[in-house]
Amino acid sequence: MTVLKIHIILFFALAINQAAAQKAKPYVSEVWVSDLGNGMYKNPVLYSDYSDPDVIRVGDDYFMTASSFNEIPGLPILHSKDMINWKLVNYAVTDLIPKEHFEKPKRGDGVWAPSIRFHNNEYYIYWGDPDFGIYMVKTKDPFGKWEEPILVMEGKGLIDSCPFWDEDGQAYLVHGWAGSRAGVKSILTINKMNPEGTKVLDKGIHVFDGHDANPTVEGPKMYKRNGYYYIFAPAGGVATGWQLALRSKNIYGPYEEKIVLEKGSTKINGPHQGAWVDTQNGEDWFYHFQDVDAGGRIVHLQPMKWEKDWPVIGIDTNKNKVGEPVMTFKKPNVGKSYPIETPAESDEFNDDKIGLQWQWSANENIVWSAKLPGKDYLRLFSIKIPDGEKNLWNVPNLLTQKFPAPNFVATTKVKLFPEDVKEGKIAGLLVMGMDYQSLVITNKPDGFYLQLRKAQKADKDGEEKILNEIKLKSNVVYLKANVNEPNGICTFSYSENGKKFENIGETFQAKPGKWIGAKIGIYSVSDSKVSRGGYADFDFFRITKN
């Protein structure tokens, strides 16, 4: 073999290895990174709407799940090695059941406040659907396929469930109640389960009533330590509440109660509902959410310690035995350091599948999109808006993701192909919530137009209106949304060459959805007068700094 051939082989081998290394390189957000790179971290660890988070450690691995409501795929699975740097790696459900029920957007319904546990070498997730009951899914591999959901307990208003297996093998399920369905809330109930955790065996026993001092107590998580049964539970409401700890030597009580985390003198409103996790080296930590309105319920991590068999979460700054949340702190000791990594946001649509950050508003129909191997774009078909709808609230084929930070820019490039239809195809960029605004390209008999559209009180059937309209030179346009503090102020702009962008319309105040934060994404639909044909190709979707 000649020296030249050897050099050529080495060159290509190096190129292949570099390409593989680049592909495997952790994604790092431009707009929010919790790891400060100096052994410290800042809260929130996730500035995204992973509401009602629950976290477990299995060996050296940490896994998180969160509420996903009607968004599909549902039950996100996030993975971390150091409790700070998280990657979205999977979902536990690909369809909500009953499948026919969730073919249409049931906003705010579906998956409420899940709990993840590791038992007998299997991973379990339990959640309450307020209309149908408590479900469970399990797997031996959290990165792989999860089994089909099992209805563990049927009933209305059953929410926020958490399993517990005692040392004697007995299995229990603690849960809360949704007043909107059950007619009562602010109580916690324990049911006995079969050892497999697939069904409850009794009507349950109420173990805590929060009506007197802890209204809206919900989201219970059960643990055992030093002979005490603990129920960690939030109370006081989503945006303004506090964290309770309940303890008893008997699983059915009576339970002592103590507030263990509150806002105090900090700016962190409603620091509650989450997970106690210990590290390999014996440290204790607590994850919880903070409701930030348009940004959703973002995830914080607090240091935790035990005093006289009570948890103290955060820092007890005023010595009242109640912790307050920290904004920065030393990273957990997990034995070694790991690279900075964040959940993916941008998507070049170069892979065979779209990124895991994307979710539909209902159970996915395969005809909504096509991501063909070897194609560097995502094709969204122009699906007809359901008859009688005045806005996008009940449109299932919206492809969106969570707000990734308080300040960011989202940019996409779209090409509209109406086929033989002369008007009524619509595709573009969307900031979705109970009020929403979109910047779209559409077609008319005389060409293509840019439109800024808006609906207020979309959840109350508010009519979508066209605010601005500009004639375009072609079927290609670049669309941008600039999102800023405070609370998601959005400015839309467009470009026909991808270089010079021009603002259009006035600023828009992003609004949360039903139990979720605002979402940003893309969509392609047909006006209700147009039944078929047409599609839009999206070349990329990028999240960058303002």
Predicted regions and their residues:
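Carbohydrate-active catalytic/glycan-binding domains of CAZyme proteins
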Residues: 21-546
